[in-house]
Amino acid sequence: AFHKRREDERADAFALVEALDYLAAQQVRIVNLSLAGPPNQALAGQIRRMDQAGIVLVAAAGNGGPAAKPAFPAAYPQVIAVTAVDRRAQVYRRANRGEHIDLAAPGVDVWTAASIRGARTKTGTSFATPFVTAAAALLMQREPGLTPAEVRARLLSSARDLGKAGHDEVFGHGLLSPPDPCS
């Protein structure tokens, strides 16, 4: 988490690019982006540079609804785009859709830390994204030499298909099936 510089709680694209540049300089191997917004040239460039540097990027698909335009950074091709499903593997009704969706993960009524009091349930693609980030981190811990493309391929190939057979605009390749942390 990064401190905010203004009273406004939202970050602009410049602040996001600056934060991602900082993370790249720290040589992180994976970044969770539980946020979504419009396309931005500077952000697209930073995402490309991080991918080329071997950094895995996982982002929330967005909560604009089925008819919403693709949200970024999830819609950039170098990013693993995550949608949210409930306990019955039904897509979150406000989740964005599109060809760029890669995986589905739990994101409805997720018990999470709250800024005011301890913890509470929250819903959205931002709450599904950390599940995929954690699964990617497990893969990378086991096999440190994996490239971002290889991490993506492993996660997508192990997903449990939901919805229409194969990749679709609602669930992507399907429900995340994380690697066993004990094997």
Task: Identify the role of each PLM range.
Residues A1-P38, A159-A165:
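Subtilisin-like peptidase catalytic core
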Residues L16, Y22, I30, F171-S183:
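C-terminal domain-closing interface element
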Residues A61, P77, A114, L155, ...:
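Hydrophobic aliphatic residues
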Residues D21-Q26, R87, L138-G145:
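Flexible, small-residue-rich helix->loop connector segments that border functional cores
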Residues E18, A84, A137, A153-S157, ...:
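Generic alpha-helical structural context detector
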Residues F2-R5, R93, G107-L175:
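Hydrolase catalytic cores
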